[in-house]
């Protein structure tokens, strides 16, 4: 691991080892300088090495080297894309894309939403989200999703979540584990307002992102 640092003046304007940090901080203080530590990490910011075309990144420190951002992707301040993760574009990313996760074109991750990767409890399951999906604010998924899927705000779907499948008339069809629905398209995950039971309905209305969010004029 290494430390990215910047001191006032010409001292410590370099990358130092973690083991050097305590002494470097002490030396800076004795000289009346401020040593600012930006990160202690194995992965630097992606934009220090690669700047993709046609993207907007509100906070460059949230995109680690090894991430992929496709043309038309916007990553807002609280969005995060880990290494070996990808937003194929165009996408609006206000949530977290974990290591190994790929989201398809036109998919929107709402504020503080997340995807469960192999580094965050997902085991060996590779999570992907298809095209024109919406993961609402504070929601998330631990199963792969096909195209045109929606998870309502605040609902986190894990592989073992009990889900009641209902038809277009609202009639209950069967109860399954969420893993049994992995990879399917046109699913709408919501909670029953009275019981809190997780329901899966057919989602025939594709989510369209606001074109203005992806304008680079």
PLM region spans:
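Glycine-rich adenosyl-nucleotide cofactor-binding module
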Residues: 22-89
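Long, low-complexity, charged/polar intrinsically disordered regions
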Residues: 13-23
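Basic (Lys/Arg-enriched) interaction patch that binds polyanionic ligands
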Residues: 72-112, 131-132
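Glycine-rich hexapeptide-repeat left-handed beta-helix
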Residues: 98, 103-105, 109-217
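Single conserved hydrophobic/aromatic residue that forms the stacking wall/gate
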Residues: 1-12
């Amino acid at each position: 691991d290494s430390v990215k640092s910047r001191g006032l003046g010409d001292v410590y304007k370099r990358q130092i080892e973690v083991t050097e940090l305590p002494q470097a901080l002490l030396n800076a203080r004795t000289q009346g300088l401020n040593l600012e530590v930006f990160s202690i990490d194995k992965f630097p910011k992606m934009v220090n090495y690669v700047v993709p075309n046609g993207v907007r990144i509100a906070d460059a420190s949230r995109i680690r080297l090894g991430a992929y951002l496709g043309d038309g992707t916007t990553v807002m301040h609280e969005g995060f894309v880990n290494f070996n993760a990808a937003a194929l574009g165009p996408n609006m990313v206000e949530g977290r894309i974990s290591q190994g996760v790929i989201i398809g074109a036109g998919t929107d991750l709402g504020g503080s939403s997340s995807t469960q990767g192999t580094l965050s409890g997902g085991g060996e399951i590779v999570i992907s989200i298809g095209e024109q999906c919406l993961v609402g604010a504070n929601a998330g998924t631990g199963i792969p999703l096909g195209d045109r899927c929606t998870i309502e705000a605040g609902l986190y779907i894990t592989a073992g979540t009990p889900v009641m499948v209902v038809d277009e008339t609202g009639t209950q069809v069967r109860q399954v584990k969420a893993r049994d629905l992995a990879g399917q398209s046109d699913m709408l995950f919501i909670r029953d307002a009275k019981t809190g039971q997780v329901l899966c309905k057919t989602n025939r209305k594709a989510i369209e992102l606001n074109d203005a969010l992806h304008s680079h004029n």
